[in-house]
Amino acid sequence: MSEALSDEALLELAEHIAVRRENDVISTQAVGELTVNATLSGVIGLIEFLRNDPNCRFSTLIDITAVDNPARPARFDVVYHLLSMYQNQRIRVKVQVREDELVPSLIGVFPGANWYEREVFDLFGILFSGHSDLRRILTDYGFRGHPLRKDFPTTGYVEVRWSDIEKRVVYEPVNLVQEYRQFDFLSPWEGAKYVLPGDEKAPEAKK
């Protein structure tokens, strides 16, 4: 494996990608690793180019994840991480998605995207068009909501338990064993008030 690309080489690679895929690339940023902000309609073609282009060769899909920004009209960032073992370099491709938009599936380019897209759907509720098996993968089939959204309550909506009487899993309203506490607030910083060994010498040194 070769050494990682220098910052200058990253800038050259960013320019190469932006020129060759000008209709798909919105902007690039090269700080240690390369980040490409892409259009939703062009993200699949861009990633296919990153895999096949001899100057890129990002042949390994590391991960697909998402970030929730509720205050933004395009609420979600869908983030793709790829690796070029030929250049010892990673790249991050980001695309902004509204809550009512479909993201094209990457399975046709990287079949391993199957489980990553199911995870993003399960945890964020983002839908992928062209995915033949978009089911939950981490939470239960009857789970309500998507737990990595910023508006998902910390207590959840329901709790699950096994009923010996009904001989099945049942869903019930959340029943907290202690009074509910609201943690959504800012606490003022208060420094430590204890005295560590040796601290008593500090006033003496000032005399």
UniProtKB/Swiss-Prot annotation:
Keywords, in A-Z order: Cell inner membrane, Cell membrane, Membrane, NAD, Quinone, Translocase, Transport, Ubiquinone
SUPFAM superfamilies associated with the record: Nqo5-like
Enzyme class: translocase
Keyword Cell membrane: yes
PROSITE patterns in alphabetical order: COMPLEX1_30K (PS00542)
Superkingdom to which the source organism belongs: Bacteria
A Pfam family of this chain: Complex1_30kDa
Extent of the signal sequence: none
EC number(s) per entry: 7.1.1.-
Catalytic activity: a quinone + NADH + 5 H(+)(in) = a quinol + NAD(+) + 4 H(+)(out)
Chief location bin: membrane
Topology term for the membrane: Peripheral membrane protein
GO molecular function: NADH dehydrogenase (ubiquinone) activity; NADH:ubiquinone reductase (non-electrogenic) activity; quinone binding
Gene Ontology CC terms, in alphabetical order: plasma membrane
Compartment list: Cell inner membrane
Gene3D superfamilies (alphabetical): NADH:ubiquinone oxidoreductase, 30kDa subunit
Subunit structure: NDH-1 is composed of at least 14 different subunits, Nqo1 to Nqo14. The complex has a L-shaped structure, with the hydrophobic arm (subunits Nqo7, Nqo8, Nqo10 to Nqo14) embedded in the inner membrane and the hydrophilic peripheral arm (subunits Nqo1 to Nqo6, Nqo9) protruding into the bacterial cytoplasm. The hydrophilic domain contains all the redox centers.
HAMAP family xrefs: NDH1_NuoC (MF_01357)
Function: NDH-1 shuttles electrons from NADH, via FMN and iron-sulfur (Fe-S) centers, to quinones in the respiratory chain. The immediate electron acceptor for the enzyme in this species is believed to be ubiquinone. Couples the redox reaction to proton translocation (for every two electrons transferred, four hydrogen ions are translocated across the cytoplasmic membrane), and thus conserves the redox energy in a proton gradient.
Family: Belongs to the complex I 30 kDa subunit family.
Protein name: NADH-quinone oxidoreductase chain 5
Organism: Paracoccus denitrificans
Phylogenetic placement of the source organism: Bacteria, Pseudomonadati, Pseudomonadota, Alphaproteobacteria, Rhodobacterales
